Amino acid sequence: MFCVIYRSPQRDQTYLYVEKKDDFSRVPEALLKGFGKPKLAMILPLDGSKKLVGADIKKVKTALREEGFYLQLPPPLESLLKIHLSDANKV
């Protein structure tokens, strides 16, 4: 199984995985509208020979089979206040 990965031009670090190049037929229209015009990032085999950054390969494969797509969102931002308070407590 292969997947085609597209990056969002509107949302930083947001990626859309589909099974076939330029086939967004199973992706909800509202998601595509918010995602923007998908920009091809890469095509990867999902056989475990390559590691996915920021996504679990099993979850991606399951989502592709069941829903027809997988949406990878950016990691949550760390709270600067939390970091500051943590550093202040170390002093």
From Swiss-Prot:
InterPro entries cross-referenced by the UniProt entry: YcgL-like_sf, YcgL_dom
Domain YcgL stretches: 1-85
Pfam families: YcgL
PROSITE patterns: YCGL (PS51648)
Protein name: YcgL domain-containing protein ETA_15380
Species whose genome carries this gene: Erwinia tasmaniensis (strain DSM 17950 / CFBP 7177 / CIP 109463 / NCPPB 4357 / Et1/99)
